[in-house]
Amino acid sequence: MFNDIPVFDYEDIQLIPNKCIITSRSQADTSVTLGKYQFKLPVIPANMQTIIDETIAEQLAKEGYFYIMHRFDEDSRKPFIKRMHEQGLIASISVGVKAYEYEFVTSLKEDTPEFITIDIAHGHANSVIDMIKHIKTELPETFVIAGNVGTPEAVRELENAGADATKVGIGPGKVCITKVKTGFGTGGWQLAALRWCAKAARKSIIADGGIRTHGDIAKSIRFGASMVMIGSLFAGHIESPGKTVEVDGETFKEYYGSASEYQKGEHKNVEGKKILLPTKGHLSDTLTEMQQDLQSSISYAGGKDLDSLRHVDYVIVKNSIWNGDSI
């Protein structure tokens, strides 16, 4: 019975420290392997139009970070793959499940991307399973990420269809309102859903949504994630593609969900919203701070690398980390 499993979210968990075995936090290794490739951090900026564009994708790839390019400028995807490969960089793109995407995937045989993410809101669907099989038939060497899902059954079905990784999270993101509009989702219990799904997984799990602090990255890894997709923490940078807005002398960046009317261009099946975030410096500074905080997490875990985070004990204390404070 589902109701027998513990239900909690990021703010309800504290990880319990172990004896530190490194002399400096800088010795902690935050690298992660996904498919045939190693990356500096187990984080992925969300593949959303206000988070990533081709310039940021190139920057991330050159600096050794993983990225997933969004699918909302469909005609630019093949030229993007070509441009990345000409620079000796990996190409990581997104596709949907509409009929014309099948022809697009087949057309990639001559210049095959290393990663393809099947990106739809409700990933436990026959349409996603069919697309996984099509990609694996046409492009067998491509690493396929599929999502989004929220149950062990979904993880097993997508893995059995050929997915190399599944993306877990239905509506926990800051600009996602799926749980309000539909009554469904993992909002409010995303970390427990991750734990539930990871126990069923044989391949990589990507936690997607609900990350509000850098410590949540360590918690995601503790509960089974190989990688963590993050939206709001990667939004609002000077180079972010979101529109810059000035309000009372302060600058803000637009940040909106992939299922918002601003993304769709129409008010139909809307499950996202738009917010303004204060502009917060450069993306590279955030990545550096994330790495330093994750190195500190590893030191508290008593290890030398990310694997040490998977074995720490934890306590569930409802809303304990804030204790009335804010950051």
UniProtKB/Swiss-Prot annotation:
<feature type="active site" description="Thioimidate intermediate">
    <location>
        <position position="176"/>
    </location>
</feature>
<dbReference type="InterPro" id="IPR015875">
    <property type="entry name" value="IMP_DH/GMP_Rdtase_CS"/>
</dbReference>
<dbReference type="GO" id="GO:0003920">
    <property type="term" value="F:GMP reductase activity"/>
</dbReference>
<feature type="binding site">
    <location>
        <begin position="205"/>
        <end position="228"/>
    </location>
    <ligand>
        <name>NADP(+)</name>
    </ligand>
</feature>
<comment type="similarity">
    <text>Belongs to the IMPDH/GMPR family. GuaC type 2 subfamily.</text>
</comment>
<dbReference type="GO" id="GO:0005829">
    <property type="term" value="C:cytosol"/>
</dbReference>
<protein>
    <recommendedName>
        <fullName>GMP reductase</fullName>
        <ecNumber>1.7.1.7</ecNumber>
    </recommendedName>
</protein>
<dbReference type="Pfam" id="PF00478">
    <property type="entry name" value="IMPDH"/>
</dbReference>
<keyword id="KW-0521">NADP</keyword>
<dbReference type="InterPro" id="IPR005994">
    <property type="entry name" value="GuaC_type_2"/>
</dbReference>
<dbReference type="GO" id="GO:1902560">
    <property type="term" value="C:GMP reductase complex"/>
</dbReference>
<dbReference type="InterPro" id="IPR013785">
    <property type="entry name" value="Aldolase_TIM"/>
</dbReference>
<dbReference type="InterPro" id="IPR001093">
    <property type="entry name" value="IMP_DH_GMPRt"/>
</dbReference>
<comment type="function">
    <text>Catalyzes the irreversible NADPH-dependent deamination of GMP to IMP. It functions in the conversion of nucleobase, nucleoside and nucleotide derivatives of G to A nucleotides, and in maintaining the intracellular balance of A and G nucleotides.</text>
</comment>
<keyword id="KW-0560">Oxidoreductase</keyword>
<dbReference type="GO" id="GO:0006163">
    <property type="term" value="P:purine nucleotide metabolic process"/>
</dbReference>
<dbReference type="InterPro" id="IPR050139">
    <property type="entry name" value="GMP_reductase"/>
</dbReference>
